[in-house]
């Protein structure tokens, strides 16, 4: 693994490696030691006591953050007829049918989220090999396969983030930007924690949140006490 740069090392020195911080302390510290030359993203990482290999311990969904993410999401909606008109009225960036299947197959990715009505999933399904590895495939669990395209587009534009447990049992989620007020970041952090607590699989045994940390785009991780949320 490549050695981190001097700015990273300087930031790391400001973190007490033996301390577990409260959510408020961790967010304040992450903001303070961030050294990016742009408005970096603040991210939280949960290490959960689940076995993702088991179907009954999969965790996936989406949550609307009360203070948004600080990023404007570009939304592509696969819909036709009245649903296409609804998507356009809701502020979708792109709305269409098979023409977008062709564009994506040719390497076009000027969007962040795809929403599709159920009747369009036959078309979207053709893109499985392209969209799947990028995490862009619409899914009913995240509210992106739906007839209510207005609600879906509005929520994404308002600051909806998707979460999914990875093979190691980790869930990562962006909770805003370094420029956000610390209190707003903490409120978003608590919202993500609350939804993950509600999503705890019945089959999960032992400690649910094993480790928790806050970081910025290039910054080091800061350990957080789950009880502080």
Swiss-Prot record:
Database matches in SUPFAM superfamilies: Ribosomal protein L1 (SSF56808)
Family classification: Belongs to the universal ribosomal protein uL1 family.
Species name: Listeria monocytogenes serovar 1/2a (strain ATCC BAA-679 / EGD-e)
Signal peptide: none
Function: Binds directly to 23S rRNA. The L1 stalk is quite mobile in the ribosome, and is involved in E site tRNA release.
UniProt keyword annotations, A-Z: Repressor, Ribonucleoprotein, Ribosomal protein, RNA-binding, rRNA-binding, Translation regulation, tRNA-binding
GO molecular function, one term: structural constituent of ribosome
InterPro entries linked: Ribosom_uL1_bac-type (IPR005878), Ribosomal_uL1 (IPR002143), Ribosomal_uL1-like (IPR023674), Ribosomal_uL1/biogenesis (IPR028364), Ribosomal_uL1_3-a/b-sand (IPR016095), Ribosomal_uL1_CS (IPR023673)
Protein name per Swiss-Prot or TrEMBL: Large ribosomal subunit protein uL1
